[in-house]
Amino acid sequence: MIQISDRAKAHFLRLIQREGVPGMGVRLSAVDPGTARADARLEFAEPSELVGDEWLIDCGDFTLYVASASVAWLDSAEIDYVTQATGSQQLIIKAPKIKGQELSQVASLVERVCWVVENEINPQLASHGGRVEVQEVSAEGVVLLRFGGGCHGCGMVDVTLKQGVEKTLMERVHGVIAVRDATDHSTGAAPYISRNFAS
């Protein structure tokens, strides 16, 4: 169930009335759900823009439409319109399930490594256009990775591996003893920092 405060309803109603489109409502959806970069998106929704499988929440003078694929991720979400200490007003959306749930310690070593790579490491690498994929996790706890995007061929990949990826995996995943790079960096087409420049 999604909770919407009366203040948020009044705020939405003011915005909808300003648009002056008959039947306009507000659509709520989850963007990149289940990942560290997950976010909630609110936008105006005219009747002609609706897909037809949205969940409807009657807010009195307008309808909040929830994208059907987002319902599970937005369950227990709270929407409020609050006044900050500075006097400014802000719309707040709290969606506790949108980023998914961290794997428990009973998850396998491979599952825990993959979860940390996908939800903590890759969002950081994405700022440089990079990414990393788990190729293998040995029974002894050695993780073999393959870098891609801006990390493929990057002159700073050794620093990224040791001070970023390996450090994070060893701190966050009990059982990881080492991290190795399986990437052929000589074939990188668009490195973030050229290996020649970094030398």
Swiss-Prot record:
Binding annotation for [4Fe-4S] cluster: 151, 154
Arranged from A to Z, the UniProt key words for this protein are:
4Fe-4S, Iron, Iron-sulfur, Metal-binding
Q: Which Gene3D superfamilies is this protein grouped with?
A: Fe-S cluster assembly (FSCA), HesB-like domain
GO molecular function per UniProt: 4 iron, 4 sulfur cluster binding; iron ion binding
Q: How is the cofactor bound?
A: Binds 1 [4Fe-4S] cluster per subunit. The cluster is presumably bound at the interface of two monomers.
GO terms in the biological process aspect are: iron-sulfur cluster assembly; protein maturation
Q: What highest taxon heads this organism's lineage?
A: Bacteria
Keyword check for Iron-sulfur:
yes
Tell me yes or no: is Aminoacyl-tRNA synthetase among this UniProt entry's keywords. Answer: no
Q: Which cofactor does it need?
A: [4Fe-4S] cluster
- Taken from the record, one Pfam family name reads NifU
Do you know which InterPro entries this protein is assigned to? Fe/S_biogenesis_protein_NfuA, FSCA_dom_sf, HesB-like_dom_sf, NIF_FeS_clus_asmbl_NifU_C
What is said about its interaction partners and assembly?
Homodimer.
Family the entry assigns: Belongs to the NfuA family.
Relate the protein's function as given in its record. Involved in iron-sulfur cluster biogenesis. Binds a 4Fe-4S cluster, can transfer this cluster to apoproteins, and thereby intervenes in the maturation of Fe/S proteins. Could also act as a scaffold/chaperone for damaged Fe/S proteins.
Q: What is this protein called?
A: Fe/S biogenesis protein NfuA
Biological source species: Xylella fastidiosa (strain 9a5c)
